[in-house]
C-alpha cells in the first residue's frame, strides 16, 4: 500500500497553477486600475500561486485602497529593497505587456481562483493520505 501512496504523492508535486493568467491579470490591472474592484471580488493575493505575484497584488491593493494609481512606477518603492532573484521593478514593466481586455482579465481571475481551489484540494488529499 505504501508504494501506491508514494505514486499518488509523486503525481501531485506540481500543484495546479496558471502563471500566464496571473501575469495577464496583474498586467491588466497595472494598465487599467479601474478593473481592480471587479477582479478583487473574484480573487485576493492568497489565490496567486507565485509568491511574487501575491506580493505584487497586495501592493496594488494597498495603493488602490489609498486612492493612488498602481503602475510600475508607483509600485517601484514597494520593491526596491526586495532581495529576490528577479528585478521586481523591471518585472512589473514586463508584466504590463501581458495585459489584456477587462473581460479577459476577469475570466483569467476565475482561472486563478479555480487553480487555487484545486491546490487546496490537493493539500487536503495529501493530509488525508498522510493520516490514513
What are the functions of these language-model segments?
Residues 1-116:
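Noncatalytic partner-interaction/assembly domains of nucleic-acid and motor enzyme complexes
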Residues 119-124:
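Short, well-ordered alpha-helical segments
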Residues 49, 131-132:
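Short, surface-exposed linear patches
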Residues 125-130:
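Short, conserved phosphate-binding/catalytic loop or strand-edge motifs used
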Amino acid at each position: 500500500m505504501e508504494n501506491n501512496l508514494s505514486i499518488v504523492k509523486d503525481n501531485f508535486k506540481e500543484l495546479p497553477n496558471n502563471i500566464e493568467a496571473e501575469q495577464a491579470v496583474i498586467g491588466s490591472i497595472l494598465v487599467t486600475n479601474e478593473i481592480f474592484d471587479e477582479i478583487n471580488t473574484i480573487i485576493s493575493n492568497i489565490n496567486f500561486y507565485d509568491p511574487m505575484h501575491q506580493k505584487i497584488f497586495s501592493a496594488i491593493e494597498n495603493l488602490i485602497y489609498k486612492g493612488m494609481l498602481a503602475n510600475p512606477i508607483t509600485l517601484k518603492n514597494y520593491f526596491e529593497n526586495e532581495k529576490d532573484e528577479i528585478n521586481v521593478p523591471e518585472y512589473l514593466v514586463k508584466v504590463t505587456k501581458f495585459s489584456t481586455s477587462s473581460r479577459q482579465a476577469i475570466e483569467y481571475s476565475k482561472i486563478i481562483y479555480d487553480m487555487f481551489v484545486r491546490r487546496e484540494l490537493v493539500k487536503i488529499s495529501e493530509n488525508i493520505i498522510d493520516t490514513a
